[in-house]
């Protein structure tokens, strides 16, 4: 329980953060729309890339700290009940594509929406009004529904809805099934092959479909969206760690990004370093692995029209790196996939590192960058990353019986990869 001094300290911290936020988001204070992005909160502006972002995150952190400090058992239970119902409502709205039926500007009759999707009007009213309690949608007048800034963002950026649907369909059922999975593993059923079967059962139970060519790509897309937006896994998009490219500014050096799951990082870096050549290697879709016919379909290289210096090609994970004259190799941290991954993250990473030994031997000046998540050491505390780290850790446990290696383990792994002619050396972390 907070004492008076602690409460006053946290209150001052919150007020200071709020002051910073209002200074960086004037349009949200005076009610103007200048600088606002459609589908975003008025506190999010086109310039929210630095101080404004940090100020908003600080406000949310302070509020969360106060809530944890002041909440009692009843508050916690009511909050969990609310979040459960909100997730159920969001899944329902997504299943029936309700957000897409509502114009981004203006409103729609709830009766018309109900007729369009074929559900009772009273049913959709009850769901919409629960969602409104969290700022998702709004009812400008009785019987009409309109987008709020929050719900509009789920339309303008479908990845948010992908993350929410995976959370509802896959993550939550698996999390609630954790006691029975623990009992099975404790009883000696912890072999990875059994875990893969369990994961397939979880996914098939929730999706009512097998992991075929149609279902698997969608599931992969939703899984990666959930990891990015639901667990704070930003390894695939972070660019601030790629400081080694500064020395190649103005040259025509080649940069290879291995295991990319999106083009976000490549496009950001291409804009920052317009003379560099970027080769983006995407892993073969899981549905194509092991099938010669399907693999041939992906055996091609394509250019990105908007960025002439970016080319994309497919590559099977762990195969020897064929681009042997690059200045920099960016290795994306491998991620498990429920029901598909057959070896641990550490094993996948070691295989990928060994696949690059020959390329680095031929180009001794080349640099290899591993984009690892910000996983704290055991016992380390930090409210900024601790919650998301624990969410991600449990998601890996429940869905793939895996975990992220700690920083010390990664360094030991890197130092241990080599052959008779040399080994990796960590020069910066």
From Swiss-Prot:
InterPro entries with a match to the protein in the record: SAM-dependent_MTases_sf (IPR029063), WH-like_DNA-bd_sf (IPR036388), WH_DNA-bd_sf (IPR036390)
What are the GO cellular component annotations? nucleus
Q: What SUPFAM superfamilies does the record tag this protein with?
A: Winged helix' DNA-binding domain (SSF46785)
Q: Spell out the subcellular localization from the entry.
A: Nucleus
- Say yes or no: keyword Cell cycle present: no
Main location (coarse class): nucleus
Its keywords, alphabetically, are: DNA-binding, Nucleus, Transcription, Transcription regulation
Please indicate which superkingdom the organism of origin belongs to. Eukaryota
DNA-binding region, residues: 110-129
Q: Which residues form the HTH iclR-type domain?
A: 80-144
The biotechnology note for this entry reads:
Secalonic acids show unprecedented anticancer activities against various human cancer cells and might be interesting for further derivatization, targeting diseases such as cancer.
Tell me yes or no: is Transcription among this UniProt entry's keywords: yes
An annotated Gene Ontology molecular function: DNA binding
Function description: Transcriptional coactivator; part of the gene cluster that mediates the biosynthesis of the tetrahydroxanthone dimer secalonic acid D.
What's the protein name? Transcriptional coactivator AacuS
